[in-house]
């Protein structure tokens, strides 16, 4: 099983020292904290706030996944050069339709050189 890098696994001191490395690899979930049952919810997953990720033939973000707890929801794949062979922030908009139960969303992303990275979880409460 591959090692999964998560923000909680890394000490505050190491995060500060290697801020660019962690920033460009760790997915961030951006969505409303509340959603309506049966209505589309936009969930944006973005890699990095400040530091762009390379988009080279041998070093790029291969895919981004969205999970609700242990349930796989969606996935987007990228080929090398998807960002024009320039460093940038991979962004994906997923649209999901929530059921009646609250969600605990997590995003995963794979860098071809630095492995599997997991976001912090995002709780979404459901309104009827």
PLM features: residue spans?
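Extracellular Ig-like/FN3 beta-sandwich strand-entry sites
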Residues: 40, 100-106
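Solvent-exposed serine/threonine-rich low-complexity stretches and specific carbohydrate-binding patches
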Residues: 73-83
